[in-house]
């Protein structure tokens, strides 16, 4: 049995992860890291703690759906107690992103801004279309529930990175987030990434390629958080057998 820990167990994804780990054959829910009171029932033998180091010591793999500051603490503690890490948190600073890279030298780390198989394939398609339709303008729109705290979403930025990669560009050099006022005409290389917030939208991402006389839009819609939870569990089961290194969900899926 593979022992699994969850960081972010009291958050929006926590209940789904707990339920799915308990149901998954070959996995044992070993530890939960909590900031607040746990609102779901778990077996008595599950360790419930606010100590990141205790979670790491109890597990073969830790799944993290939390916040950047918690992920930073997790990585810092994991450097002392190397454990396979599945990271699905978004909104990292450059320093926090570097911590993931450092941790991956000592343990297997899988980081993806979105754990769904559909988004994994969409990234590949976006890069391919971007490279093929070189004269098309690229605009990305993401929609999420009113409670999401970071914008644009990590998934939208990842899609933007793949779009830029398809044209040999760096997203940081060409990204535009929002437009207002007399800003002038759109530049040739810019990639816009727009964020909409409202209601209970789980997640919707559209990458549009626009030209005179025609346009193509690639769209992915998540209708349940179970998609992300089950994707993270699939990643965890795969990751425990990997060597030290930094992986993505695409590596797990072999695409």
UniProtKB/Swiss-Prot annotation:
Recorded superkingdom: Bacteria
Subcellular location: Cytoplasm
GO CC annotation terms, alphabetical: cytosol
SUPFAM superfamilies: Glyceraldehyde-3-phosphate dehydrogenase-like, C-terminal domain, NAD(P)-binding Rossmann-fold domains
InterPro entries: DapB_C, DapB_N, DapB_N_CS, DHDPR_bac, NAD(P)-bd_dom_sf
First-level EC class: oxidoreductase
Listed CDD domains: DHDPR_N (cd02274)
Binding site for NAD(+): 8-13, 88-90, 112-115
Enzyme Commission number(s) of this protein: 1.17.1.8
Main location: cytoplasm
NCBIfam families xref list: dapB
Family, similarity comment: Belongs to the DapB family.
Role this protein plays: Catalyzes the conversion of 4-hydroxy-tetrahydrodipicolinate (HTPA) to tetrahydrodipicolinate.
Stated name of the protein: 4-hydroxy-tetrahydrodipicolinate reductase
Protein species of origin: Sulfurovum sp. (strain NBC37-1)
Lineage: Bacteria, Pseudomonadati, Campylobacterota, Epsilonproteobacteria, Campylobacterales
């Amino acid at each position: 049995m593979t022992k699994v820990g969850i960081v972010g167990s009291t958050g929006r994804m926590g209940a789904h992860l707990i339920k799915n780990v308990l149901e998954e054959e070959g996995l044992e829910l070993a530890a939960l890291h909590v900031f607040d009171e746990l609102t779901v029932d778990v077996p008595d033998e599950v360790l419930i703690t606010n100590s990141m180091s205790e979670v790491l010591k109890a597990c073969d793999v830790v799944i993290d759906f939390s916040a950047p500051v918690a992920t930073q603490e997790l990585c810092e503690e994991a450097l002392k107690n190397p454990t396979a890490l599945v990271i699905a948190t978004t909104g990292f600073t450059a320093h926090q992103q570097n911590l993931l890279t450092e941790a991956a030298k000592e343990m297997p780390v899988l980081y993806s801004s979105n754990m769904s198989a559909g988004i994994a394939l969409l990234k590949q398609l976006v890069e391919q279309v971007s490279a093929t339709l070189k004269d098309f303008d690229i605009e990305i729109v993401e929609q999420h529930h009113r409670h999401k705290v970071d914008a644009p979403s990590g998934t939208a930025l990842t899609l933007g990175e793949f779009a830029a990669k398809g044209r040999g560009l760096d997203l940081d050099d060409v990204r535009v987030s929002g437009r207002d006022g007399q800003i002038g005409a759109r530049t040739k290389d810019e990639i816009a990434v727009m964020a909409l917030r409202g209601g209970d939208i789980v997640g919707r991402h559209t990458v549009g390629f626009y030209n005179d006389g025609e346009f193509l839009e690639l769209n992915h819609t998540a209708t349940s958080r179970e998609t992300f939870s089950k994707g993270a569990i699939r990643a965890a089961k795969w990751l425990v057998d990997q060597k030290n290194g930094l992986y993505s969900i695409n590596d797990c899926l072999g695409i």
